[in-house]
């Protein structure tokens, strides 16, 4: 690492330690070299012992800047990984950053589109309409048709900042994974998922494609409106779309003043969500209040407006089927069915004891269902399910995590608009109708017709496919032997690395103690400790 990265690495470590976040790792999970090294950093003590661990984690991420703020926001949706108190605190993170100079935005747009602003747009406002950590938004008009538009532009020089922080986060994740084997949090995988999410946000062509798809799915719909994307003007760092005017969905007073039917609006939000999931298999996965507006027009026939389609979710047919059956089984209190569906779908390991899983579900969910249905939080049911399934080693399902987050948003918005909203009564007819379409002779015949061309094409090739499969099995047996040898080599390297890290920490502590009386000996010890640490880290990072 270069000097700049070492400084940033120290800053990250010192902020985390000053907020006492080393306490998040149980002492019995900390190898003795780590405990020894932590004691040597005696000047970095927890300065906020009176705060909860969730508050300390949130404040630490806020202090580390936009990359860590967005990481915390992503972690807040991973209820399958984090304890509830941490997830709820991280959900409070706000993506508030100062805007950058409008002249820089102008130059960025001109560079991306290859023409001066004046040749394409009129009334370009250099004062941003909105600003976030990755991009900011300016208003203008299209010269070709005088349409009002917004231009979203990526922050200049944001990519090197993101790459540096992600590289350091990946290094920290590798160290955590090495020091705490079999960690359910899977830190390296989490950082990799975050990297992909950030890269998607940096490519505005991806957001444009998502918005176009969502708009097509709800074309001529009275329930949801998605602004028009001007794709000819879109580039990787620039997105141009129709400017919309609406009432923020969180501004209930303004909605009431406009005469909006809040009950119908809340119910339509639920219908829009389930339509996206079960009809289209493609849903807007970032419907927090800042991304949702309500049309001023036709307040007695209200229409939602969705913006910022940077994050979307998709579900395959099998996931939709299991999800719908799970929802119906939940509210019929058929916990056995829920447990069996989780095993059949592969969401929990196949050796899970269904009886134990059923009993755990009943213990957690039965008190919830003792309430009237109108008072039950659909999202809370999913949260309790995830927390229970986590104890049974539920495999992470990114699409379900996004769906659960979106459902929490929709339910929260719906109950804010109309506190008596019975989400189950609104959703149940939709789910039952969808299930009827998926089960029965008509559904079976439809599936056969869909698959018939595929099997007709593959049938003549079946002998060759069987032979190729048997050959691959034999080849994979040889690969397994090779992987077994690699595992033993890696295990040996990790054992050596543990020794080097422990020796380095011990020498460092000894050098600090010897420094006042034996400066030369302390310098030698410090040099050797650095060599040990570098060698140990090198062994950790080797594949």
From Swiss-Prot:
Cite the CDD domains for this sequence.
UbiB (cd13972)
State what protein this is by name.
Probable protein kinase UbiB
* Active-site feature positions: 286 (proton acceptor)
Subcellular location as annotated: Cell inner membrane
Entry keyword annotation includes Glycosyltransferase:
no
Family annotation (InterPro entries):
ABC1_dom (IPR004147), Kinase-like_dom_sf (IPR011009), UbiB (IPR010232), UbiB_bact (IPR045308), UbiB_kinase (IPR050154)
Residue spans crossing the bilayer:
499-519, 521-541
Functional description taken from the UniProt entry: Is probably a protein kinase regulator of UbiI activity which is involved in aerobic coenzyme Q (ubiquinone) biosynthesis.
GO BP: any one term? ubiquinone biosynthetic process
Where does the chain bind ATP? 129-137, 152
Q: In which pathway does it act?
A: Cofactor biosynthesis; ubiquinone biosynthesis [regulation]
Q: Which residue intervals define the domain Protein kinase in the entry?
A: 123-500
Q: How does it sit in the membrane?
A: Multi-pass membrane protein
MF-aspect GO terms: ATP binding; protein kinase activity
**Top-rank taxon:** Bacteria
Q: Which cysteines does the record link by disulfide bonds?
A: none
Q: Which UniProt keywords apply?
A: ATP-binding, Cell inner membrane, Cell membrane, Kinase, Membrane, Nucleotide-binding, Transferase, Transmembrane, Transmembrane helix, Ubiquinone biosynthesis
Entry EC no(s): 2.7.-.-
Q: Which N-terminal stretch is annotated as signal sequence?
A: none
Its main localization is membrane
Q: Which family does it belong to?
A: Belongs to the ABC1 family. UbiB subfamily.
Report the source organism.
Answer: Tolumonas auensis (strain DSM 9187 / NBRC 110442 / TA 4)
Q: Name one GO cellular component term.
A: plasma membrane
């Amino acid at each position: 690492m270069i000097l700049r990265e070492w400084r940033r690495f120290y800053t990250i470590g010192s902020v985390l330690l000053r907020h006492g976040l080393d306490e998040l790792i149980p002492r019995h999970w900390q190898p003795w070299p780590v405990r020894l090294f932590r004691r040597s950093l005696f000047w970095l003590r927890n300065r906020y012992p009176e705060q909860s661990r969730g508050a300390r984690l949130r404040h630490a991420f806020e202090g580390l800047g936009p990359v860590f703020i967005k990481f915390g926001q992503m972690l807040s949706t991973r209820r399958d990984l984090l304890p509830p108190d941490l997830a709820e605190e991280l959900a409070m993170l706000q993506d508030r950053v100062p805007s950058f100079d409008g002249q820089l935005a102008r130059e960025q747009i001109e560079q991306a589109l290859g023409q001066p602003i004046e040749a394409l747009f009129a009334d370009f406002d250099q004062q941003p309409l909105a600003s976030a950590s990755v991009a900011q938004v300016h208003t203008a008009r299209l010269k070709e048709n005088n349409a009002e538009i917004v231009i979203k532009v990526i922050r200049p020089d944001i990519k090197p900042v993101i790459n540096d922080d992600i590289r350091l986060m990946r290094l920290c994740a590798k160290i955590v994974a090495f020091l705490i084997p079999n960690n359910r949090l899977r830190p390296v995988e989490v950082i990799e998922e975050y990297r992909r999410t950030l890269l998607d946000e940096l490519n505005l062509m991806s957001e444009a494609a998502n918005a176009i798809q969502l708009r097509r799915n709800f074309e001529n719909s009275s329930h949801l409106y998605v602004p028009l994307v001007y794709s000819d003007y879109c580039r990787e760092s620039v997105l141009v779309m129709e400017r919309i005017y609406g009432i923020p969905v969180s501004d209930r007073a303004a909605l009431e003043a406009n005469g909006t039917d809040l009950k119908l609006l809340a119910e339509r939000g639920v219908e829009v969500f389930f339509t996206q999931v079960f009809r289209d298999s493609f849903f807007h996965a970032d419907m927090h209040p800042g991304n949702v507006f309500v049309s001023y027009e036709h307040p007695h026939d209200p229409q939602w407006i969705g913006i910022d389609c940077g994050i979307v979710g998709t579900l395959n047919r099998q996931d939709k089927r299991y999800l719908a059956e799970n929802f119906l089984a939940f509210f019929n209190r058929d916990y056995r069915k829920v447990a069996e569906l989780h095993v059949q779908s592969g969401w929990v390991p196949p050796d899970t004891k269904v009886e134990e899983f059923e009993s755990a579900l009943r213990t957690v969910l039965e008190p919830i269902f003792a309430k009237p249905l109108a008072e039950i939080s659909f999202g809370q049911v999913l949260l309790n399910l995830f927390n229970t399934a986590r104890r049974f080693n539920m495999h992470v399902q990114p699409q379900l995590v996004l769906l659960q987050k979106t459902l929490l948003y929709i339910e929260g918005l719906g109950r804010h608009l109309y506190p008596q909203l019975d989400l189950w009564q609104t959703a149940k007819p939709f789910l039952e109708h969808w299930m009827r379409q998926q089960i029965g002779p008509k559904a079976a015949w439809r599936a056969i017709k869909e698959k018939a061309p595929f099997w007709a094409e593959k049938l003549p090739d079946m002998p060759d496919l069987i032979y190729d499969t048997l050959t691959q099995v034999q080849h994979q047996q040889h690969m397994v032997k090779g992987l077994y040898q690699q595992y033993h080599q890696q295990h040996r390297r990790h054992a050596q690395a543990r020794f080097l890290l422990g020796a380095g920490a011990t020498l460092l502590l000894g050098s600090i103690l010897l420094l006042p009386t034996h400066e030369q000996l302390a310098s030698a010890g410090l040099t050797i400790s650095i060599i040990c640490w570098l060698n140990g880290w090198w062994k950790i990072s080797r594949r």
